[in-house]
């Protein structure tokens, strides 16, 4: 986690921000094309990309896959409430959930429950199995609430990067 007081993004200039915006749009863009779009020659552009990678602004590159083509059509969000009787229940839960490939995201949140999970499964029977055989058996789980997504209205991994 980055210390919010240091705010490393403040040191990015307009070109760095443009590079990040272009890479968010297309992570497979060639360095030559990227350099044209941000107004640099290829060598300094590549040097900036490598620096942004070293500094942690760019954490990696991935392919966006179509879940409907890959037997993962059902998107489900799950609220998890833990039994807070055990002193290390949060650490145990965190460790256990890291091992579950079916869980795409897990967030510790404030409010009436402790965690919000995002999972994708083939269908409702697969989710029922995941819930009954896995999620309810995670360390400290006291209660769950399930929200089945009926329609994905918007999905994006892009961050808003102001170019100043």
Curated annotation (Swiss-Prot):
DNA-binding annotation, residue ranges on this chain: 31-50
UniProt keyword Transcription regulation, yes or no: yes
SUPFAM superfamilies given in the database record: Dimeric alpha+beta barrel, Winged helix' DNA-binding domain
Domain HTH asnC-type residues, every copy: 12-73
Keyword Magnesium attached: no
UniProt keyword annotations, A-Z: Activator, DNA-binding, Transcription, Transcription regulation
Entry superkingdom: Bacteria
Coiled coil, from the record: none
GO molecular function: sequence-specific DNA binding
GO cellular component, one term: cytosol
PROSITE patterns hit by this protein: HTH_ASNC_1, HTH_ASNC_2
GO BP annotations listed: alanine catabolic process; regulation of DNA-templated transcription; response to L-leucine
UniProt cross-references to InterPro entries, sorted A to Z: ArsR-like_HTH, AsnC-type_HTH_dom, Dimeric_a/b-barrel, Tscrpt_reg_AsnC-like, Tscrpt_reg_AsnC/Lrp_C, Tscrpt_reg_HTH_AsnC-type_CS, WH-like_DNA-bd_sf, WH_DNA-bd_sf
Purpose: Mediates a global response to leucine. Exogenous leucine affects the expression of a number of different operons; lrp mediates this effect for at least some of these operons. For example it is regulator of the branched-chain amino acid transport genes.
Subunit structure: Homodimer.
Protein name (database record): Leucine-responsive regulatory protein
């Amino acid at each position: 986690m980055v210390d919010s007081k240091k705010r490393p993004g403040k040191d990015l200039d307009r070109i760095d921000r443009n590079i990040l915006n272009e890479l968010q749009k297309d992570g497979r863009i060639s360095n030559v094309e990227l350099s044209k779009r941000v107004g640099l020659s290829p060598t300094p552009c590549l040097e900036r990309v490598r620096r942004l990678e070293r500094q942690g602004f760019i954490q990696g590159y991935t392919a966006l896959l179509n879940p409907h083509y890959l037997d993962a059509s059902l998107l489900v969000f799950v609220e998890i409430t833990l039994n807070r009787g055990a002193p290390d229940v949060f650490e145990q839960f965190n460790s256990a959930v890291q091992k579950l490939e079916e869980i795409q995201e897990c967030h510790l949140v404030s409010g009436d429950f402790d965690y919000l999970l995002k999972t994708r499964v083939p269908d409702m029977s697969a989710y029922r199995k995941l819930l009954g055989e896995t999620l309810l058996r995670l360390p400290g789980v006291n209660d769950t609430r399930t929200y089945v997504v009926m329609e994905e209205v918007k999905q994006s991994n892009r961050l808003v990067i102001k170019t100043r």
